[in-house]
């Protein structure tokens, strides 16, 4: 595990550790740390956290190369590089780039990171390809796609096998990733949740996304079928990585990232929000 001893890192950890409980985290967004560096560290097995304070990126390592999930903003790429290098790894050893969904805070820097890696393969869920290609790159780069994924397809590198699950709603191609890792002689199921249901989401009468309510309902149903040991996500407020990292740094056992109850609470809260939003918006649909 790589832990920063700098005062800045300690202040960041202390500040983020007071994030809301998992039962409420889904609806409380804190974007103040999106562009702030956070100590890279081992989560479990061959899974490492290399994101910022509230935008989460994950590295799955192997002797054959690494898989990166989420590149985030172009302006946060220096933080990503530093996070990877502090683990004793190289950007050029990243062979595959994946994403949670086609929003700039998770995939804007994909073209830039592909160049830095020397040509890592970029893979995107089919339904998100149009939105991903339309992402504005501040540096003017064209977003690349080397492989288009379908629901249930697997991405393999070395001994790592990641399965892409279509969980639409946040975007049409919102992708939840699952895998199994080994740690301490045991197997652990890992899930990286794609995106949550915002408390101000327009589910009824959404002209830009007419299927959004049904898509979220389908995704909630699918999320209920998963039983992960390790719950990760694209945003920090879903699962409190700062608090878990702080406890992990102090030698807490079992590993604080083992949190099946936190995952179940997140799914239950999403379903509760969906029911409330649909009921409320049916009473007052948007004006034509």
Task: Name every feature range the model reports, one short phrase each.
Residues 1-11:
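Bacterial N-terminal signal peptides that target proteins for export
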Residues 9-21:
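Bacterial N-terminal signal peptides
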Residues 23-25:
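Boundary at the C-terminal end of the N-terminal hydrophobic targeting segment
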Residues 33-87, 176-197:
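Conserved beta-strand hairpin/beta-sheet module of binuclear metal-dependent hydrolase folds
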Residues 46, 60, 70, 101, ...:
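Divalent metal-coordination and catalytic microenvironments
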Residues 66, 73-75, 145, 154-156, ...:
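Metallo-beta-lactamase
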Residues 75-78, 85-154, 266:
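Active-site HxH/HxHxD metal-binding segment of metal-dependent hydrolases
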Residues 260-288:
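C-terminal regulatory/interaction regions
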């Amino acid at each position: 595990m790589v832990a920063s001893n700098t005062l800045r890192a300690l202040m960041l950890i202390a500040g983020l550790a007071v994030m809301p409980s998992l039962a409420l985290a889904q609806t409380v967004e804190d974007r103040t740390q999106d562009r702030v560096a956070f100590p890279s560290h081992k989560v479990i097995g061959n899974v490492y956290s290399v994101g910022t304070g509230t935008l989460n990126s994950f590295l799955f390592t192997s002797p054959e190369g690494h898989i990166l999930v989420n590149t985030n903003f172009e302006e946060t790429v220096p933080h990503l590089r530093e996070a990877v290098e502090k683990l004793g790894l190289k950007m050029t050893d990243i062979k595959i780039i994946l994403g949670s969904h086609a929003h700039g805070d998770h995939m804007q820097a994909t073209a830039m990171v592909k160049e830095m890696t020397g040509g890592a393969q970029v893979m995107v869920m089919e339904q998100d390809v149009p939105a991903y290609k339309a992402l504005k790159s501040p540096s003017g780069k064209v977003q690349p796609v080397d492989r288009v994924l379908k629901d249930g397809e697997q991405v393999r590198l070395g001994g790592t096998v990641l399965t892409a699950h279509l969980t639409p709603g946040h975007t049409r191609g919102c992708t939840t990733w699952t895998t199994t890792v080994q740690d301490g002689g045991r197997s652990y199921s890992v899930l990286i949740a794609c995106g949550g249901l915002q408390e101000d989401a327009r589910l009824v009468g959404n002209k830009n996304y007419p299927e959004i309510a049904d898509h979220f309902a389908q995704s909630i149903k699918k999320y209920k079928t998963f039983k992960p040991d390790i719950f990760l996500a694209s945003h920090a407020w879903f699962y409190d990585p700062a608090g878990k990292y702080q406890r992990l740094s102090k030698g807490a056992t079992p590993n604080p990232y083992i949190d099946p109850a936190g995952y179940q609470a997140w799914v239950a809260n999403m379903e509760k929000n969906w029911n409330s939003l649909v009921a409320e918006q049916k009473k007052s649909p948007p004006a034509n």
